[in-house]
């Protein structure tokens, strides 16, 4: 979070404690893989923990651009950010720049079926297949609305964004279709678990889909506040 804030829970999320962090820069995303947590944020900041989030160190970052999202897949961390920046690492401690096909801001990144997918401003969607995030191509996007989050489940990618936008791909992120949304509120995060996609956003809006993202319904939300992420 803000000012390098990192908090940790060891009781299944019942209570959290502050953790000492090596940065005062705002951190915007966190991922986990190979027994390593990696968090990314403004000014290209990347920090890592190899002891279940108890202690953190700065990782080597090749960029000063904001990094807004990170995911782990195929033994690789991939983070994305402003100006189309994409960075990758095999260990979480040292990252390298990857050639990006776009210069628009990338905000969210997901992984599934050996494919990385990143989404961002103006409906931008890019993907990397079979080479652990080393090479990226543009995907066909059906929207010009900003996209903020992307998730994979049951052989489908789902991305969400401005004005209730929901788009879906069933061919490893190559082509995408608009999906009817029950809201015009901005959707910021999306996650998958128990055969269900859940999206959340402004005004406490929560949506769910139980048919691989093909149709969506409003869920009962206990808050009018903005929701920025969904995890499972």
Regions inferred by a protein language model and the residue ranges of each:
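Residue-level hotspots at or immediately adjacent to binding/recognition sites across diverse folds
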Residues: 1-232
């Amino acid at each position: 979070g803000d000012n390098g804030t990192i908090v940790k829970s060891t009781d299944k999320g019942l209570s959290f404690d502050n953790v000492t962090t090596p940065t005062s820069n705002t951190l915007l995303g966190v991922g986990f893989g190979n027994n390593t947590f990696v968090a990314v944020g403004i000014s290209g900041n990347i920090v890592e923990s190899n002891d279940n989030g108890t202690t953190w160190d700065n990782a080597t970052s090749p960029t000063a651009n904001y990094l807004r999202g990170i995911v782990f897949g195929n033994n690789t961390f991939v983070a994305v950010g402003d100006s189309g920046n994409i960075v990758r690492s095999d260990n979480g401690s040292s990252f390298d720049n990857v050639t990006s096909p776009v210069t628009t801001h990338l905000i969210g990144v997901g992984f599934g079926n050996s494919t990385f997918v990143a989404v961002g401003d103006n409906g931008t969607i890019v993907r990397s297949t079979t080479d652990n995030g080393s090479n990226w191509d543009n995907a066909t996007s059906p929207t010009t609305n900003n996209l903020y989050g992307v998730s994979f489940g049951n052989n489908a990618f789902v991305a969400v964004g401005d004005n209730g936008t929901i788009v879906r791909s069933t061919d490893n992120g190559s082509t995408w279709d608009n999906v009817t949304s029950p809201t015009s509120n901005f959707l910021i995060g999306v996650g998958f678990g128990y055969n269900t996609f859940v999206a959340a956003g402004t005004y406490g809006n929560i949506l769910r889909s139980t048919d691989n993202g093909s149709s969506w319904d409003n869920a009962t939300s206990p808050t009018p506040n903005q929701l920025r992420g969904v995890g499972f």
